[in-house]
A protein has these predicted regions:
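Phosphodiester-processing cores and adjacent nucleic acid-binding clamps
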Residues: 1-110
Length: 110
């Protein structure tokens, strides 16, 4: 039995986590394999848009004889109330529109 401690990443964001992730799922998987991991969890923010990439690339590696196990995941969020969340989101959207309108009506002096 080996004394080597195995590591598996259980929290990774790809390009499908806007503003927070880098690389496509297959890039993450290749990096994991190159660094001795035999599994990796892809946990993008609120979506599983990278799932097909993850599945196809994992199957490709398995056909090549690599023992890699994809872990399918998602980073989810808990909210107290859908109604309250909708109100807060509407207020944020309203403020964004008002701010954009102000910016468009502002004169720029150089």
């Amino acid at each position: 039995m080996s004394n080597q401690i195995k590591f598996v990443g259980l929290h990774a964001h790809s390009v499908f986590s806007v503003f927070d992730g880098l690389g496509y799922p297959q890039d993450h998987i290749d990096y994991a394999v190159e660094n001795g991991m035999d599994a990796l969890a892809l946990t993008d923010h609120g979506n599983m848009n990278g799932l097909a990439y993850q599945v196809l690339h994992s199957k490709k590696l398995q056909k090549e004889g690599k023992d890699f196990k994809p872990i399918y995941g998602i980073e989810g969020y808990f909210i107290d109330s859908v109604a309250k969340w909708k109100e807060e989101k509407a207020e944020i959207d309203k403020n964004k529109k008002g701010r954009k309108k102000k910016e468009l009506n502002s004169a720029v002096v150089i």
